[in-house]
């Protein structure tokens, strides 16, 4: 069952739309490098389209109404109310907006031999050696005890300083090079170099000051953000690769960017949601946090946030009813939108070609994920697979079915099984990615476009 290369069949109008979607996507990648930034960006975009915050709704909701709810600034759910009763179920697109990164600890700032560092703890599954000697940026928030929230974004503008995690020079790395890849760079060595210039006497340096470089860094932070060192205790600072999303390849057919797992699915789901109107079944797009560490916590998919919001919607459309909430969830159908591993000829030994996802061949569906004997997976029903195929065929969407890699080589999971716990039909679907979980990941522009088309077709035809 060879799948067609989508590039070969596009019309001139489709190529024009493809470029527009991918340009829009790159802007979103640049603006949304953390889960908080993604939520702020999403709220800005959906409010332009008439979406209202659910907490501000006092009257009942009717078909055509658009609402959204935010959880702690890190997850968001948006709904376009359909003509059918909510208890008949929804068509749901679900993706995650957190990505592997390095987080700053709560007591991070220290000096060692006239060099200032931020102590860190990595987040998600990373190859630690990939994060050294790269230009890095600092994003996040500092929250003071009076409730003031100060946004931080250093390293993205052309005239901003950047930061780095250093590595041992090759001339002295004999022992280091003998280590396994997992141990070449240890987690405790991923500390961020942020300064080397001591505070000067004219700037308030005490004669007996031992950590003059640290003091200078703290002075700069105080000048810019009005913060004290204690404010690190209530800060969330994330270290991400500095720089914009770029076209990749002489033919500009690909995108190289940070965080495409899973923002390529999140943003294409968002675009699809914004571009549908007048639906029969209520459409929903939910973008969540914490997937990379197990979907735990208040902002992860395991929380009751989504269920609580659906209960609010039922109350505002059909009147309060726990039974109708349960029916609305069980009768829903979902695409768990998460990325797949693209077949990489450089590492062909990791893939089984008949069950691999290929660049340029469209939206990828995974009947199941998990590891080895399908452990921990959501295994979608054949009847639902057929329904999804019909929806894709209805609008001539290019798509392919794949597994992550060879059976016993490893595995992975998504939010699919969590939503399936409600009894709804769920299948994983997303975009094939090269160098997944690396600081810079690669996607095909054709696949980005087909994901947008596929998600839109799902909302309209299921």
Regions found by a protein language model. Name each.
Residues 1-462:
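N-terminal hydrophobic/helix-forming segments and targeting peptides
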């Amino acid at each position: 069952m060879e799948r067609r290369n989508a590039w070969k069949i596009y019309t001139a109008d489709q190529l024009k739309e493809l470029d527009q979607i991918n340009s829009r996507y790159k802007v979103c990648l640049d603006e949304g490098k953390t889960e908080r930034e993604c939520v702020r960006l999403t709220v800005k975009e959906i409010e332009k389209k008439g979406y209202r915050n659910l907490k501000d709704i006092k009257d009942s909701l009717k078909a055509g109404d658009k609402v959204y709810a935010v959880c702690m600034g890190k997850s968001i759910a948006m709904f376009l109310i359909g003509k059918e009763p909510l208890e008949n179920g929804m068509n749901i697109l679900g993706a995650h907006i957190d990505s592997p990164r390095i987080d700053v600890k709560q007591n991070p700032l220290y000096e060692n031999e006239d060099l200032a560092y931020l102590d860190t703890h990595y987040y998600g599954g990373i190859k630690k050696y990939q994060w050294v000697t790269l230009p890095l940026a600092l994003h996040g928030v500092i929250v003071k005890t009076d409730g003031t929230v100060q946004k931080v974004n250093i390293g993205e503008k052309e005239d901003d300083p950047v930061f780095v995690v250093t590595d041992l020079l090759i001339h002295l790395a004999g022992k280091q090079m003998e280590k396994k890849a997992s141990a070449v760079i240890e987690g405790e060595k991923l500390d961020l170099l942020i300064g080397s210039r001591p505070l000067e006497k004219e700037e308030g340096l005490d004669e007996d000051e031992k950590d003059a470089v640290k003091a200078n860094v703290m002075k700069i932070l105080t000048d810019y953000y009005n913060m004290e060192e204690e404010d690190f205790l209530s800060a969330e600072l994330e270290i991400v690769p500095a720089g914009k999303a770029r076209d990749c390849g002489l033919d500009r057919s690909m995108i190289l960017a940070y965080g495409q797992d899973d923002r390529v699915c999140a943003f294409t789901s968002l675009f699809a949601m914004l571009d549908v109107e007048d639906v029969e079944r209520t459409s929903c797009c939910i973008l969540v946090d914490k997937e990379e560490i197990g979907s735990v916590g208040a902002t992860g998919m395991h929380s009751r946030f989504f269920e609580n919001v659906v209960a609010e919607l039922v109350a505002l459309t059909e009147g309060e009813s726990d039974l109708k909430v349960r029916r609305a969830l069980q009768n829903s159908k979902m695409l768990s939108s998460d990325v797949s591993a693209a077949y990489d000829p450089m590492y062909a030994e990791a893939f089984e070609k008949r069950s691999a996802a290929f660049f340029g061949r469209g939206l990828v569906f995974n009947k199941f994920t998990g590891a080895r004997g399908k452990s921990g997976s959501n295994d979608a029903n054949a009847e639902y697979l057929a329904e999804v195929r019909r929806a894709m065929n209805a609008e001539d969407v290019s798509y392919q079915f794949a597994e992550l890699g060879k059976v016993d080589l490893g595995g992975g999971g998504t939010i699919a099984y969590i939503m399936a716990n409600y009894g709804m039909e769920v299948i994983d679907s997303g975009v094939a990615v090269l160098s997944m979980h690396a600081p810079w990941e690669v996607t095909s522009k054709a696949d980005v476009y087909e994901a947008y088309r596929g998600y839109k077709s799902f909302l309209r035809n299921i």
